[in-house]
From Swiss-Prot:
<dbReference type="GO" id="GO:0036431">
    <property type="term" value="F:dCMP kinase activity"/>
</dbReference>
<keyword id="KW-0808">Transferase</keyword>
<dbReference type="GO" id="GO:0005524">
    <property type="term" value="F:ATP binding"/>
</dbReference>
<dbReference type="GO" id="GO:0006220">
    <property type="term" value="P:pyrimidine nucleotide metabolic process"/>
</dbReference>
<feature type="binding site">
    <location>
        <begin position="17"/>
        <end position="25"/>
    </location>
    <ligand>
        <name>ATP</name>
    </ligand>
</feature>
<dbReference type="InterPro" id="IPR003136">
    <property type="entry name" value="Cytidylate_kin"/>
</dbReference>
<dbReference type="Pfam" id="PF02224">
    <property type="entry name" value="Cytidylate_kin"/>
</dbReference>
<dbReference type="GO" id="GO:0005829">
    <property type="term" value="C:cytosol"/>
</dbReference>
<dbReference type="InterPro" id="IPR027417">
    <property type="entry name" value="P-loop_NTPase"/>
</dbReference>
<keyword id="KW-0418">Kinase</keyword>
<dbReference type="GO" id="GO:0015949">
    <property type="term" value="P:nucleobase-containing small molecule interconversion"/>
</dbReference>
<dbReference type="GO" id="GO:0036430">
    <property type="term" value="F:CMP kinase activity"/>
</dbReference>
<dbReference type="InterPro" id="IPR011994">
    <property type="entry name" value="Cytidylate_kinase_dom"/>
</dbReference>
<keyword id="KW-0067">ATP-binding</keyword>
<keyword id="KW-0963">Cytoplasm</keyword>
<keyword id="KW-0547">Nucleotide-binding</keyword>
<comment type="similarity">
    <text>Belongs to the cytidylate kinase family. Type 1 subfamily.</text>
</comment>
Length: 228
């Protein structure tokens, strides 16, 4: 596999894919394998939402929200989201925080501040960025762009296992229906539709273990950047 674009001094690997394709897990493990920084862009929006609640900033105060986004101390380590040094991985998954994230993201100043924060994660020795628009808008010059795919059945099985392990009840038929509906919404929406970048590598993980998927991504990257 040959490089198709000039490399930035600090390399980026972007990973996208549909819900329950394993992109978050794969991104975290690839970052750990290569010693790269990690960015979970979806979690970043939720972190901003959580902070706005904690600092009592109104969801319609665009200027104050944008200022807050620029000042937050945020880190991602092995899939753990930290805000001001505290693990808030569970807190940001609350439904009300998800709704708040959608509410604040409609403001152009907030989106601009979040884009700047995402790009600021690009530091030596490199970055693995997980999320929509990473390879098309945020890091169009990424060294490697990966789009994970998997059958809806495989993804539902994974999601079912995750929920059971966390102590939640789960129905496979409901999960299958929810994933199909989510895929349709994501692929047809006007803003950031679910589709791979034109120069992305497609990786079907239906029959792959997490370790196998990680190994393939790392192999692709090292083929492009042999000294890595």
């Amino acid at each position: 596999m040959k490089p198709t674009r000039p490399f930035h001094q600090t390399p980026v690997i972007t990973i996208d894919g549909p819900t329950a394709s394993g992109k978050g897990t794969v991104a975290a493990l690839v970052a750990a394998e290569l010693g790269f920084h990690l960015l979970d862009s979806g979690a970043l929006y939720r972190l901003a939402a959580l902070a706005s609640v904690r600092y009592d900033i109104a969801a319609d105060d665009a200027e104050a929200l944008a200022k807050l986004v620029g000042e937050l101390h945020i880190t991602f380590r092995e899939g753990i989201a930290q805000l001001d040094g505290a693990d808030v991985s569970t807190d940001i998954r609350a439904e009300e925080i998800g709704n708040r994230a959608s509410a604040i993201a409609i403001h152009a100043p907030v989106r601009a501040a979040l884009v700047a924060r995402q790009r600021a994660f690009r530091k030596q020795p490199g970055l693995v960025a997980d999320g929509r628009d990473m390879g098309t808008v945020i890091f169009p010059d990424a060294a490697l762009k990966v789009f994970l795919t998997a059958s809806v059945e495989a993804r539902a099985t994974r999601r079912h296992k995750q929920l059971i392990q966390k102590g939640f009840s789960a129905n496979m038929d409901d999960l299958l229906r929810d994933l199909r509906e989510r895929d349709e919404r994501d692929s047809q929406r006007a803003a950031a539709p679910l589709k791979p970048a034109a120069d992305a590598q497609l990786l079907d993980t239906s029959a792959l273990s997490v370790d196998q998927a990680v190994e393939q991504v790392v192999q692709w990257y090292r083929a492009l950047v042999p000294q890595s």
